Each structure stands twice: as C-alpha cells, then as structure tokens.
From Swiss-Prot:
It is found in: Nucleus. The lineage of its organism: Eukaryota, Metazoa, Chordata, Craniata, Vertebrata. Residues 531-590 are annotated as: Disordered. The gene is Nub1. This is NEDD8 ultimate buster 1. Residues 539-561 have a biased composition (Low complexity). Residues 549-597 are annotated as: NEDD8-binding 2. A motif (Nuclear localization signal) lies at residues 413-430.
Length: 614
C-alpha cells in the first residue's frame, strides 16, 4: 500500500510538471473512456521511474478516473448545490483503494451527515465519530457553520471493532454494542473528569483530601499562569495525556478525538505555545495517530504539523539543544522525540513521492535509534537496584548508557523531585491557610483567591488589595450558603456599628451590602472615612432576602449523591491515566519505531535498486 502511494505521488508530480490534463483528449475520449495516449504516457513514466509499465498504466488510469469524477462532481455542485464528500472508511471496510463518495447539501446538520454515512456504509450511527478538517463534527451545527465545503475529506472513526460476520452472530453483536457504549461513555467521562480537575486547579483545595492537577515547568516546579489561559492549558494537557494513554494501548480511534480536543484548547493559549514542548509533542502524536489509522491521506497538513513541531522544539530547547542542556544537564531523553519526528517526516515525504528526502529523514531516524538503543542487561541491572524499567530507560539515555551514572542520575532526580513536591505542597498549604484567614474575616473564597493572586500570595498585601477594592468583596462563591444577603440587618448588628461611631443609616446600609457581616461593614466604613464607597452604595437597594430552603430541595439529595459518585468516577479514570513520572512522554521502548524504520527504508532502497538495475 505504501509503495503504491509513493508511485501515485510521483506520477501526480510528473503530470503536473508536464502540464498533462488526463480528463481531456487525447487521454480521455468523448465518451469518457481511456484514450490510447495513456499507454504512451505509461511507457514514458515507467522508464523514468524504472518500474513496471503495466503498474504505472493502472495507476495513471486511477488518477484519470478520479479527475473525471471530480470534474463531474464540481459541475453537479455548481448546478444543484449538492456537495460531494470523500469518505475515508476504517481499513476493514475499504475496497481495493476505491474512493467512497457521498453527496449532501451543506445546510444539513452534522447529525444528518452522520446518519447518512451510517446508513450508506453500514455503521451503527451512535458508534461512529466523523473528523473533518482535523475537528470532530458537531452534531447540532450545520455543515456550512463548521466550514465543511464541496470535495472535503471526512474520516470515520469506529468506536467498536466489528467482525465481518457480526450480523450473523447476535451474541457477538450484543457484546460489541456493549463495548461501543462503554467506549462512548469513557470519552464522555474523560471530558467531564478533565473539566472537574481544571476547575479544581482554580479552587483552593486541600491536597491531602482532594486530587487536583497542576502545571509545572521542566524542573517540576509550578508555573504562574493567568487563570483563563491556565484553564485552557490544563484542559489541553489533560486531553493530551488521555489521548497518549489510548495511544499506548493502541486504541487509535479513541485517542484521536482526545488529541484533536487537546489541539483546540492549546490554540486558546497561543502565547505559551513557543515556550512549552507539549504542543510540539502533540503535533507528533496527532500525525502518528493518523498514520497508525492508515489515514495520513486525510491529514492534508501533516507536513505543516511536523514543521511546526520542529520549530517549537527549537524554540523550547534552543539551538543544538543548548537551553535544554542548561536546564537539565543533558538532552539524551529528548532525542526520542526527534527520532519520532524524523521518522514521520520520512514517512510523509515517501507518501508524497519525495524518495530522496524520505531516505534522508529515515536514515537520521535510524542513526538516532542506534544511539538510543538500550542493552536489556543494563535495564536488568538497574531493576536489581530497585529502580523501575521506565526510570532505567530514561536514566540510561540521559547518561549515554552508563549504568553507574544512570543509577546516580535517577537517585538524584528522585531526591530533587521529592524536595520540589514538598515545597509545592507547603506552598499550597500556606495558600489554603491564607484563604481561610481571609474567609474568617468575612471575605468570600473567590475574593480571597483573587486578592492573594494579585498580592503574589502575601496575606498582608492581599488584605490591602481588598480594602482598596471593595467591589472585589462581591465576587461570589459557587456555594450559595456562602453568599447570604440580608434584607433587614439585626438591630444588634446596627447597634454594634453605631457604638463604634458610625452613623445609623450608613451602618444599616453597610450591613445590607455585606449580608449582615459586622466585621466587613466596619472595615469598609473605617477605610472610607465613615461612608460607603459610591460603587457599593447601590447594592443595599438591591438586597433581597436569601431564599429559604424548600421541601423539594431535600428531594434532590439522592440525585446529588449520584452525580457526586459519577464525578468521582470520572476524576479517578483521568487520574489513572496521568503518569506518575513527569517524563513519561519521553519514555519509549522504540519497538514500533524500529520495525517501521526498517519497513520504510526497504521501500526507498527498492526505489534506488530499481534505478541501478536500469
């Protein structure tokens, strides 16, 4: 298949260079049948490519037929408005490399298109996902709204792995339906779990009792990132980790939607993309996923993604990895990423008909593989010392295969990370204490968090921020119990403020604004010379009684408990796939890469062998 793709790409190049239009005479007759001139063309190009004339003729005929189909489709679209979509099916449903075309109007919804694809090609509608232009098709929006155009490519991802005789075996069909439902639920739980963890990252939680995710730099220390970008980055990295977990299990059809979601969220924090290598790794993972799904043809910008990854690595690691070496002391582990990059660049060039470029990249990948290959006995020696296989591989690559140096490196890194985690945990604990201190003074959790963020964690400065910005005190918590407001403050509270020297009317207004909180009202009035600041004076007019709990509220207890259980399940499922080792993305046995490098090098070698023989 790969060799045929190469020939197709080369012949397409030749046809463009020679400005040959196969859909016109003398290559196509009036009745659209093949003309005799195609044979002459096949002979000319087969000599140029040093390969079988008959094979070249067959591929030229395929290209000619596709060109005619495209021209017919274009004319049909101009006259009727009915668009043609090229559907790329899973490998088990492809028939002799024949194109699968579907006609539709572009005002229909994504759900309509999914239904049409399911009916046409024999899928169960709820168990497929459609990817167009590297985005999942949204069911509720029209195709036009989602940028779907005439002649677009649509890839079908099947959430169940059907057998050819699935319809003959009812028991097997039922099992596979259950499997598909399970996979769909997993995808939905992934989304919810990541949203919960991203929200917790913005909350002040006790790290001892509530799991949360954090974003760290290459040394393992937390990064200060603006809240809006932080949430987008958290979701991007979370989806990426989940996608990588599916990649490890070779569940490429489920991995791809996660990776594409990660790409979408990364694009919401573009200023950070050049400073972290995560985005570059994601581009590699997306191209790798398309390749393993045998759908590289659907990824029109594979070359662009790989170039983007290369540029991002250079920005993050520096010229010749100088910045990386300065931070980490070595770059041995990161070479795994460059091996994957060169391999994919080799594959992409081969599929594009660029044999020499493919050979160059594949040879670079092979050279890196030789450098990164690890003697199993050395891994065994480190296992005997109590290290994990992952630590052993990473340590040996960081230390050029020296076992003693690797053992020291791993031990030092363990100690360094333990210290960093201890410091980060203490920092989180102090922040929690500071928030609770401000809450004890009457401020909302949200106001306390924002003030501490502005004051870079300093409690005294945060208090000054709050006193200088009373409008912040109305930042509300999610918990309505923390947002109580009083229509009529108690006389006792009013008397307390009057006793402190404040005017009765002003005291009552302040208590209305601050929900009866005497301490907040007193602090505000004292800070502003005995009166409410203008931006808070209207609040007292709008105060309304806190709604009392109705009997129906208690009826939701069971439902809330169920929702909480589901959220816990979703979070736990995410946490299971978040690797404990911060350099997990750099760890690979390189077994798959070794096989694929050899396979594609054999393809490019066969090209040069044919050239020499001729």
């Amino acid at each position: 298949m790969a060799q045929k793709k190469y020939l197709q790409a080369k012949l397409t190049q030749f046809l463009r260079e020679d400005r040959i239009q196969l859909w016109k005479p003398p290559y196509t007759k009036e009745n659209k049948e093949v003309g005799l001139a195609v044979k002459d063309l096949a002979k000319k190009y087969s000599e140029r490519l040093e390969c079988c004339e008959n094979e070249v003729e067959n591929i030229i005929e395929e290209i000619r037929r596709k060109a005619i189909e495209r021209g017919t489709g274009n004319e049909h679209y101009r006259t009727t408005g009915i668009a043609t979509i090229e559907v790329f099916l899973p490998p088990r449903l492809r028939k002799h490399d024949k194109k699968s075309l579907l006609e539709t109007r572009l005002h229909v919804t994504g759900r309509d298109l999914r239904c049409q694809i399911a009916e046409t090609f024999g899928f169960q509608e709820n168990y497929i996902k459609i990817v167009i232009n590297k985005k999942q098709l949204q069911l509720g929006k029209s195709l036009e709204e989602q940028g779907v155009t005439h002649n677009v490519k649509a890839m079908v991802l099947e959430l169940k792995q059907s057998e050819e005789d699935v319809r003959k075996n009812l028991q097997l069909e039922e099992e596979e339906q259950n499997e598909a439902e399970l996979k769909e639920r997993r995808i939905q739980r992934t989304k919810r779990g990541l949203e919960i963890l991203a929200e917790r990252a913005e909350m002040v939680v006790d790290p001892e009792t509530m799991p949360y995710l954090d974003i760290a730099n290459q040394t393992g220390r937390s990064l200060r990132i603006p809240p809006a970008e932080r949430k987008a980055l958290m979701l991007a990295m979370g989806y990426h980790e989940k996608g990588r977990a599916f990649l490890k299990r070779k569940e490429y059809g489920i991995a791809l939607p996660c990776l594409l979601d990660a790409d979408r969220y990364f694009c919401e924090c573009k200023e950070l993309l050049d400073t972290v290598d995560n985005y570059a790794v994601l581009q590699l993972d997306i191209v790798w996923c398309y390749f393993r799904l045998e759908q590289l043809e659907c990824l029109d910008d594979a070359e662009k993604k790989l170039n983007l990854a290369q540029k991002c690595f250079k920005n993050c690691y520096g010229e010749n990895h100088q910045r990386l070496v300065h931070i980490k002391g070595n770059c041995g582990k990161e070479k795994v990423l460059f091996l994957r990059l060169y391999l994919l660049q080799g594959i992409q060039n081969y599929h594009s008909g660029n044999g020499e470029e493919a050979r160059e990249y594949l040879n670079k990948a092979r050279q890196l593989f030789k450098e990164l290959y690890i003697d199993p006995s050395k891994v065994h020696n480190l296992l005997q010392l109590g290290f994990t296989a992952q630590e052993a591989r990473l340590g040996l690559r960081a230390c050029d295969g020296n076992v003693d140096h690797a053992a020291t490196h791993i031990s030092n890194r363990r100690e360094e990370l333990a210290q960093i985690r201890k410091e980060e945990k203490e920092k989180r604990r102090r922040r929690l204490e500071n928030v609770n201190t401000l809450r004890g003074m009457g401020y909302s959790t949200q106001a306390a968090k924002q003030a501490l963020h502005q004051a870079r964690g300093n409690l005294d400065d945060a208090l000054k921020v709050l006193l200088s910005n009373p409008h912040m005190w109305w930042l509300q918590d999610a918990d309505p119990e923390n947002n109580s407001r009083q229509a009529s403050p108690s006389q006792e509270s009013i008397n307390q403020l009057v006793y402190m020297g404040f005017d009765t009317v002003v005291a009552e207004a302040a208590l209305r604004v601050f929900g009866g909180n005497v301490q907040l009202a007193a602090q505000t009035l004292a800070h502003h010379g005995g009166s409410l600041p203008p931006d808070l004076q209207f609040s007292g007019e709008d105060s309304s009684p806190t709604p009392s709990t109705s009997p129906s509220d208690s009826a939701g207890t069971s439902s809330a408990s169920t929702d909480e259980d589901m959220e816990t399940e979703a979070v736990n499922e995410i946490l299971e796939d978040i690797p404990e080792h911060e350099e997990d993305y750099l760890d690979s046995t390189l077994e798959d890469e070794e096989v694929i490098i050899a396979e594609y090098l054999s393809y490019v070698e066969s090209i040069s062998s044919a050239a020499k023989n001729n």
